[in-house]
Regions:
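N-terminal acidic, glycine/proline-rich low-complexity segments
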Residues: 1-205
Length: 205
């Protein structure tokens, strides 16, 4: 499956340092990141997204689980992506709840608010899975142990990587469980009927 290189920095401001105290130095807890066997697509992420949606109009669902820099760049590259994409599902924001990097800001939006405002302001179907949703979906070490047992290679890797994340949450909340932020957005793509939705305008300030 093709992988395209994304933007290195936010749209109009300096990038924040990675949250290695939450996810570890490479994003996998204490585990090292493995070098990929293949090479990235020759196109950057913005071009790749636009061309993929144009090639399959009305079929592609984009699920964004990080800052929205690449989606905003795709809007700049080809504004017609709003007509060719089926919908956008993103993990980010916080509706009627606190933030996780400040009193009101969620990390993915906070890391590139200009891009987020462009994405929310575009004329396409956006589903926001915010902290008000993801902090209700929690997993325990036992859940990951079951995953490792049922899928030893991938599940075993996730079980090992999750230990760092459990340590972070336990130090913060006193409970050995963790919020399932990004997986909640993915589940909203694969099984949208598990969620209840509200239609509201969103602006990033």
């Amino acid at each position: 499956r093709p992988v395209a290189r994304g933007a290195a920095i936010p749209r109009y401001r300096a990038g924040a340092p990675p949250a290695d105290f939450v996810h570890g130095g490479e994003g996998f807890g204490d585990l090292p990141a493995k070098q990929p066997a293949g090479k990235p697509d020759n196109r950057d992420a913005a071009q790749f997204l636009c061309e993929s949606c144009a090639a399959h109009p009305g079929e592609v669902i984009i699920c964004a689980v990080g800052p929205l820099t690449n989606l905003a760049a795709a809007l700049d590259h080809d504004p017609s992506i709003t007509q060719t994409v089926k919908r956008v599902v993103l993990m980010g924001g916080s509706a009627a709840r606190h933030g996780n990097v400040s009193d009101c800001a969620e990390a993915n939006i906070w890391n590139d608010p200009d891009a987020a405002d462009a994405v929310f302001g575009a004329d396409w179907h956006v589903t926001m899975i915010g902290l008000d949703v993801t902090e209700k979906t929690q997993c325990t070490p036992e859940d990951f142990a079951t995953l490792a047992e049922s899928a030893p290679v991938i599940g075993g890797f996730l079980e090992q990587a999750s230990r760092f994340y459990f340590d972070f949450h336990e130090a913060k909340t006193g409970k050995r469980s963790c919020f399932m932020h990004d997986p909640s957005a993915i589940i909203a793509v694969t099984d949208p009927g598990l969620f209840r939705y509200e239609r509201d305008p969103v602006t990033v300030v």
